[in-house]
Structures are given as C-alpha cells and as structure tokens.
A protein has these predicted regions:
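Short alpha-helix
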Residues: 183-206
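A short SAM/SAH-binding and catalytic strip from SAM-dependent methyltransferases
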Residues: 103-116
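A short acidic, Gly/Pro-enriched loop at the edge of an enzyme's catalytic core
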Residues: 92-103
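Class I SAM-dependent methyltransferase SAM/SAH-binding core
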Residues: 44-46, 50-93
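Acceptor-substrate binding/catalytic loop of class I
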Residues: 141-145, 176-190
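A short glycine-rich, Lys/Arg-flanked "PGG" loop and its adjoining helix->strand segment in the class I
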Residues: 117-132
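Conserved class I S-adenosyl-L-methionine
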Residues: 1-39, 52-56, 73-76, 80, 132-171
Length: 239
C-alpha cells in the first residue's frame, strides 16, 4: 500500500523536498546527523526517496548505497546524484550479502515500509557485528493527535489510538503552490523498539528534538513543537 502511494506522489515529493527551508527536514535533520557515527566503509540508506538524505550524508564523507521501493523516486535520486548507487528493491528483502555494511539509515522511512519488522531484521542481517542503525520517524505521540489551531499555545488533543497495532494515516497539504499527500503506517514506541529488540539491536541513544528559539522567533506557531515532539530519533547497535 505504501509503495504505491509513494510511486504516485514521487514528483510532488521531489518538488517538496528540494525547496530549501520548506519542510521540517531543514530544521530537524541537524539533530539527526549529530546521532550518526563518523563514516567508515559503507553506509546503507533504506527508503531514500528522492535522495536528499543520501546527498547530505555524502557531504559528510559517507560512501552510500541507497534503496527505495519506488521506481520513480530511484530515478529522481539517480538524476540528482551520480556519485552513489541507487537501487530499487523491497526493504524487507535486501539484495546484499550478510554483514556488508557498517551503518544503516532510515530517515522518515520506517513508517513508509509495509513490513517494518522485516526491514529492521534485514538491516540487522546486512550490518556487520557492531554496526549501527540510525532512524528518524514521526513521533508516535504526534501521529496520535493534533493541535487545535496554529497558535503557539494551542492545546494538543489525542484523538486517535496510540496503543495497539499499527494504523494507516494520511494527510493532504497544500502550501505555497506545492501539493503533497503524506501517508504511511503509525506505530507506538513498542512497535519500533520491539522490532529492534527482536532483530538483536541495543539502543544507544534516543532524541526528541525541539525547534530552536530563532525558528520560533520567525514563526510563533513553531512554539507548538517546543511542547510536543514532532520527531523521534535513535541510534542502535547490532550485538
């Protein structure tokens, strides 16, 4: 279901992701890169989309192999970056030999993978002993609720189910001439961390980053995201 959605949204997503300072990535990705270890031999990005995370990792010295389930997104990623390898494949069945990477990165992609648990297990398979998995997801609390308004002090209301099995979410947004439909799977914390535990990972670090004060000074509605976490990030190591 998720793969078909992103195939349809590929062009819209490329326009959205590539407009500088347009979406949350520009505010939150520095927190994520602070979690990522220094480059070693090979880094795998799973769910690379149009490739912006891989390009940013390359600028930080990583040698990247990136995969995505969408043909269109892989084509866009290749067009923007001839220095790395981009492959279309299922994250739940990676075409790599065991213990062939030092680092696996999932930036806002675990919730887009139909079989999240198998994707985590596959990441463990292709990582060397002591290899690291770094991930960012929409925070499970943010997925379960909404702010009542755009005001900085707006109440946050949980109006969906947090506990239990995964649930499908979708949101349509039009802003500054760009249109995007976001959709994927929402999990509770136990869903993500249970998958890591069963795959043999130990969590080293967890972050719930907040926007900084200069961001709030430019847009007072961002104060909402200093009270409720928008994203959850972690670093885990393969035993």
């Amino acid at each position: 279901m998720s793969r078909e959605h992103w195939e349809r949204q590929a062009s819209n997503w490329a326009d959205w992701a590539r407009r500088p300072d347009f979406d949350a990535y520009w505010k939150y990705s520095p927190h994520f890169f602070d979690l990522v270890p220094h480059p070693r031999d090979r880094t795998l990005e799973v769910g690379c989309g149009e490739g912006r995370v891989s390009r940013d990792l390359t600028r930080r010295g990583h040698r990247i192999v990136a995969v995505d389930a969408s043909d269109h997104l892989i084509h866009l990623a290749k067009d923007a970056d001839q220095n790395n390898s981009y492959l279309r494949c299922d994250a739940a069945c990676l075409p790599f030999v065991d213990e062939s990477f030092d680092l696996a990165v999932f930036y806002n992609s675990l919730m887009d993978i139909d079989d999240m648990e198998s994707a985590v297990r596959e990441a463990a398979r292709v990582l060397r002993p002591g290899g690291v998995l770094c991930a960012c997801v929409t925070h499970p609390i943010a997925d379960a609720g909404r702010f009542e308004s755009g005001e900085g002090d707006s109440p946050f209301v949980i109006d969906d189910t947090y506990l239990g099995d995964r649930r499908w979410f979708a949101a349509e947004i039009e802003r500054d001439g760009l249109h995007m439909i976001f959709a994927g799977w929402a999990y509770p914390l136990e869903g993500y961390f249970g998958a890591l535990e069963r795959a043999g990972f130990a969590i080293q670090a967890v972050r719930e980053p907040r926007v900084d004060q200069p961001t709030v000074a430019r847009n007072s509605s961002e104060e909402r995201w200093r009270r409720i976490p928008n994203f959850l990030m972690w670093r885990a190591v393969k035993a």
